[in-house]
Regions:
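Beta-propeller and closely related beta-pinwheel folds
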Residues: 121-272, 301-304
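Short proline/glycine-enriched turn/loop motifs at strand-loop junctions of beta-rich domains
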Residues: 56-60, 198, 369-374
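Extracellular/surface-exposed low-complexity repeats and stalk/linker segments enriched in Gly/Pro
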Residues: 2-30, 36-45, 260-268
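Short beta-strand segments and strand-loop junctions that repeat across beta-rich extracellular domains
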Residues: 7, 29-36, 143-167, 290-298, ...
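Small/polar beta-strand repeat architecture
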Residues: 2-4, 22, 38-123
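Beta-sheet repeat architectures centered on beta-propellers
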Residues: 221-236, 242-439
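Residue-level recognition of conserved beta-strand edge/terminus positions
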Residues: 27, 68-69, 138
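Tryptophan-centered short beta-strand motifs
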Residues: 1, 38-40, 47, 211-216, ...
Length: 439
């Protein structure tokens, strides 16, 4: 029975004059004679006890295991089939150090020497995330000669059990998916285990009753090799797609990297702190860049050329491992030696003019807060050549206006570039124009 007690005196043929409690194996069903109703009653669940030295030491009751190597060496083909049926996935009902009990019917006891294996296995998985007190994973490939394209969930609260199927809401779970291609990443987003391929995402709706459901959304997914770019910043999920960086809020992903131009990046690794998304990527020339996206302002900044192996947020800072030095770097400088003033540059968009006449600039009025120095450059009519236009120097770190006169030059449009070293915050730019003729 379920406690491991042996059923005694089980008849192989129907007794002619049974007493109450008499047992009889009718084919594959164990029956008990009910003296009150004078009829045979099927025993709903029959158990088999397997005894072997230390067989139960490594397991717990409720574990899902796979049995193999069980065989009956007698002459009865019926009993051989009963023993062979035990070679399957089972749930341990009871256990001791030297025995386990599983669901199964054998009509005769037998002993064998060697060959028996009991395994508790986790499936091979490409990516894993945690959600709703379970681990969830995915796998695309070939297993035992068969194509595999599946998602998995472990038993509730038990990461060791992935094949425990007892008909309960806490059981392990697995499902096949129909989308093509390899998995490229996984993340817990808004409580949903979310799995990505390059052109689709699959989201699992976790059910308290165990009836979990998979939905798929054809969209820009995670680029192959950029699974570490998945990161939540201000409740929005950011990641590196094949051609752009995407933001996903639970509906459909949108691109946020138009300002980075047509450069193709790969092997992205990212982390988040506050409202900022830090991402280290390899560009098309093979060099790495560390870029920062300010989600609140929609601005991109290039920090430096660091290659980050991975990011982790802790102690009110964001840390990453620098691949060049294998050192831990605090992005916000709360630990270690703070770096000195950094060089910076900012380039405006194309600034056109509202008047039909050819115009020329007489000066720029810049309102900024600065502690350091900056140089001003101008580019006329998208010529590709930057012309030096002046230098700013202000060490106090307060806000003030600077009038920057420029040599008059007629043009259709102009771009401005500021570069310098130290602290700088730009509030406004005013252009002072002089009008000329159409000639």
């Amino acid at each position: 029975d379920a406690e491991g007690a042996l059923y005694e005196n089980v008849a192989q043929t129907e007794p002619t004059d049974p007493a109450g409690g008499t047992l009889w194996v009718d084919g594959k069903v164990l029956k008990r004679w009910d003296g009150t109703s004078s009829m045979w009653i099927s025993v709903p669940t029959v158990y088999t006890k397997i005894s072997c030295t230390d067989i139960g030491k490594s397991f717990s009751e409720g574990d899902g295991v796979t049995l193999a190597g069980i065989a009956y060496t007698g002459d009865s083909e019926t009993v051989k089939a009963e023993y062979a049926a035990l070679n399957a996935s089972k749930v341990i009902q009871k256990k001791g150090d030297n025995w386990i009990v599983v669901v199964g019917l054998v009509s005769r006891n037998a002993a064998q020497t060697g060959g028996l294996t009991v395994k508790r296995e986790a499936p091979e998985m490409d990516y894993i995330c945690q959600a709703q007190n379970r681990l969830w994973g995915c796998r695309y490939g070939v297993k035992d000669g068969k194509a595999v394209n599946e998602v998995y969930g472990c038993k509730l609260g038990d990461f060791k059990n992935w094949t425990c199927y007892a008909g309960l809401s806490t059981d392990s779970w697995a499902a096949q998916v129909g989308s093509d291609g390899a998995w490229t990443g996984a993340v817990n987003y808004q409580g949903y285990p979310t799995f990505f391929k390059e052109n689709v995402l699959h989201r699992i709706s976790v059910s308290g009753a165990g009836a979990h459901r998979v939905t798929d959304t054809p969209c820009r997914g995670v680029q192959k090799g950029s699974w570490r770019s998945l990161c939540v910043v201000n409740e929005v999920l950011y990641y590196k797609g094949r051609t752009e960086i995407c933001a996903y809020d639970g509906s459909v992903p949108v691109a946020v990297s138009a300002e980075l131009g047509d450069e193709r990046y790969s092997e992205a690794v990212a982390g988040g702190y506050g409202r900022k998304y830090y991402i280290s990527m390899k560009n098309s020339s093979g060099a790495y860049e560390l870029l920062v996206y300010d989600a609140a302002r929609g601005l991109w900044h290039k920090e430096d050329n660091a290659q980050a192996i991975m990011f982790a947020a802790a102690d009110d800072d964001l840390f990453y491992i620098d691949a060049a030095t294998n050192r831990l770097v605090a992005a916000n400088g709360t630990q270690g030696t703070r770096e000195g003033d950094v060089e910076w540059s900012v380039v405006s968009g194309i600034m056109g003019y509202e008047y039909p006449d050819h115009k020329y600039l007489s000066r720029f009025d810049l309102r900024l807060q600065m502690r350091g120095e900056a140089n001003l450059y101008l580019q006329y009519d998208s010529s590709g050549q930057w012309h030096y236009a002046g230098r700013l120097l202000w060490k106090k770190g307060t806000t003030r206006s600077f009038a920057m006169p420029v040599i008059p030059r007629r043009c259709d449009h102009v771009q401005l570039k500021l570069s310098g070293k130290g602290e700088m915050r730009l509030f406004s730019i005013a252009r002072i124009l002089e009008l000329g003729s159409d000639m």
